[in-house]
Design a protein with these regions (language model features):
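Acidic anion/phosphate-binding donor-loop and adjacent secondary structure
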Residues: 169-171, 195, 211-231
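Conserved acidic donor-binding segment of nucleotide-sugar-dependent glycosyltransferases
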Residues: 354-355, 359-366, 375-381
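Conserved donor-binding/catalytic core segment of Leloir-type glycosyltransferases
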Residues: 222-255, 266
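Nucleotide-activated donor-binding/catalytic signature segment of Leloir-type glycosyltransferases, i.e.
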Residues: 268, 275-299
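Short alpha-helical donor nucleotide-sugar binding micro-motif in glycosyltransferases
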Residues: 295-296, 303-308
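Acidic donor-binding loop of glycosyltransferase active sites
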Residues: 306-321, 338
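Carbohydrate-associated surface elements
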Residues: 189, 210
Length: 416
């Protein structure tokens, strides 16, 4: 299935961008980059194999590229067989097949088979003007992209983010980096780790996502002076209900606040532990002070940023090693001068300077989180000061255009 509004190829050809799912609400940073690359004059062809989200952000509709979809469940075998017979005599097919056999010998999984099959299909269905394959996330998307690039004889690059880095084996990442022209990542910690694994550290580039601020209101909203004594202070969190977000820790912290302190917490986002969190809130007697809105589009989320008093995101490391890098929602909240309370974990301190542009507490520490919540709920003056300081810093140091220009330059060099 393809859109009918794909751009005409430029003289330099098009770029195949492989993403797991499009559109995906939780990955606005990917949409922001792709729309930005189009604004830099690059013509894209999107290949995707995951189930798209039903709700779209406005930025998803700005993308002009053709979107080429594969089956989101398993492998379309008739399509694979047609592709196989089309590409099996290509010079790169033997090397791709050898890589697949080595991978299956090391660890035979259905995922590896699906990745190989998808790579074969994409390689067979690539338009003639594709000059390069570029994947978002160094996990399964890069596995698929690597097979496709090998078969088609095209250069490969990828953008690594968070979970894909920290839940992949070192050997797997090392092997993929060896096959790439270059790789970008969005945090200093991630860049240092990937550089350590790469045979050529110079091919790993630290490029922050930042924000395209033209998508957000520029003027800070007027906020009230709620201090928890009368009208409830409005707390907001935006993020999937998954372990690494620390929302279970937040519920424990909220339950320890004084009973006479008035607050209301709103959570935006779906996720696999949403029912678990709702059960926890009920057990703690907090259900009547919590709203769970599920997935929302960007316009609704911006309204919530502007109508809330404090943004809370207590990130931590999950039991499987998954972690956030630098959550975009923190930058989004700060862009609306909303005071932020988070943790001194992963790359969050690259954005938030504790006590100056926000407040950071140790991860998975409900006691410290309760103390910070108590203080900030009672102090509209501190919230305003932190919100304005965060607003000034994020808009001066985390603008997206520079990073997008850098990625566009890397892509053009590889596509020559």
């Amino acid at each position: 299935m393809s859109s009918s509004s794909s751009p005409k190829p430029a003289d330099g050809g098009r770029l195949c961008v492989l993403v797991h799912a499009w559109p995906r609400l939780s990955m606005t940073f990917v949409a922001q980059e792709l729309v930005g690359l189009e604004s830099q004059g690059l013509n894209l062809w999107i290949a995707t194999y995951g189930k798209p989200d039903a709700i779209r952000h406005p930025i998803h509709d700005q993308l002009k590229a053709e979107v080429h979809r594969l089956a989101d469940k398993g492998v379309d075998y008739p399509r694979f067989l047609r592709a196989f017979f089309k590409v099996r005599r290509k010079p790169g097919f033997a090397a791709a097949l050898a890589l697949f056999r080595r991978s299956m010998k090391a660890r035979a999984t259905r995922r590896e088979w699906r990745s190989f099959a998808r790579g074969v299909i994409i390689a067979a269905e690539l338009p003639a003007d594709i000059r390069m394959v570029y994947a978002h996330f160094i996990g399964s998307a890069t596995t698929v992209a690597r097979y496709a690039a090998m078969i088609a004889g095209l250069p490969l690059a990828a953008s690594a983010h968070a979970r894909d880095i920290w839940t992949s084996s070192e050997d797997n990442i090392r092997d993929k980096l060896s096959a790439m022209d270059w790789c970008t990542t969005c945090t200093k910690l991630g860049a240092e780790y990937l550089q350590k694994l790469s045979g050529d550290p110079a091919k790993v580039h630290l490029i922050y996502h930042g924000l395209s601020f033209d998508r957000f209101p520029s003027d800070p909203p007027r906020r009230g002076n709620a201090d928890g004594s009368d009208a409830p202070v409005q707390l907001l969190s935006v993020g999937r209900a998954v372990e690494k977000k620390g929302f279970d820790v937040l519920l424990d912290a909220l339950s320890k606040l004084p009973a006479n302190l008035r607050w209301h917490w709103t959570h935006v986002g779906g996720g696999k532990i949403l029912d678990q969190l709702q059960n926890q809130a009920e057990a703690l007697g907090l259900s009547n002070r919590i709203s769970s809105l599920g997935a929302q589009d960007q316009r609704q989320i911006i309204d919530l940023y502007r109508g809330s008093d404090l943004f809370v995101l207590p990130c931590r490391e999950a039991s499987d090693g998954d972690r956030d890098g630098l959550p975009n929602v923190l930058m989004e909240a700060q862009s609306q001068a909303l005071a932020c309370l988070s943790t001194d974990f992963s790359e969050i301190p690259e954005l938030i300077i504790d006590g100056q542009t926000g407040v950071l507490v140790p991860p998975a520490d409900a006691v410290a989180l309760t103390e910070a919540l108590d203080r900030l709920i009672r102090s509209p003056e501190e919230r305003e000061q932190l919100g304005l300081a965060g607003y000034k810093r994020v808009r001066s140091k985390f603008e997206a255009d520079g990073g997008i220009r850098e990625i566009a330059g890397l892509l053009r060099k590889s596509m020559q």
